[in-house]
Amino acid sequence: MGIARILSAVLFLSVLFVVTFPALLSADHHDGRIDTCRLPSDRGRCKASFERWYFNGRTCAKFIYGGCGGNGNKFPTQEACMKRCGKA
């Protein structure tokens, strides 16, 4: 009975790997993390007013960042934004 359970577990893990591996290589991931260029602009939770750039799906656009929080789709310059996301 023990070998049957082991074989079942190996089969299950193999199928799970085959099913999930292509998703890990999809365009929504970059170096194992969700591609930040696809995230919406996020002002953050603080009240400061910093000019930042985010990728909107086509190009880089300005937005006002509050100074803390937010997500990875914020860049200090348009050039930095385009370098990271221009080919997204």
Curated annotation (Swiss-Prot):
Name of the featured protein: Kunitz-type kappaPI-theraphotoxin-Hs1b
Domain BPTI/Kunitz inhibitor: 37-85
GO CC annotation terms, alphabetical: extracellular space
Annotated CDD domains: Kunitz_huwentoxin
Signal peptide residue numbers: 1-27
PANTHER family (UniProt xref): BPTI_KUNITZ INHIBITOR DOMAIN-CONTAINING PROTEIN, KUNITZ-TYPE PROTEASE INHIBITOR-RELATED
GO molecular function, one term: potassium channel regulator activity
Compartment(s) of residence: Secreted
Record-linked InterPro entries: Kunitz_BPTI, Kunitz_BPTI_sf, Prtase_inh_Kunz-CS, TFPI/VKTCI-like
Similarity comment text for this entry: Belongs to the venom Kunitz-type family. 02 (native) subfamily.
Biological process according to GO: envenomation resulting in negative regulation of voltage-gated potassium channel activity in another organism
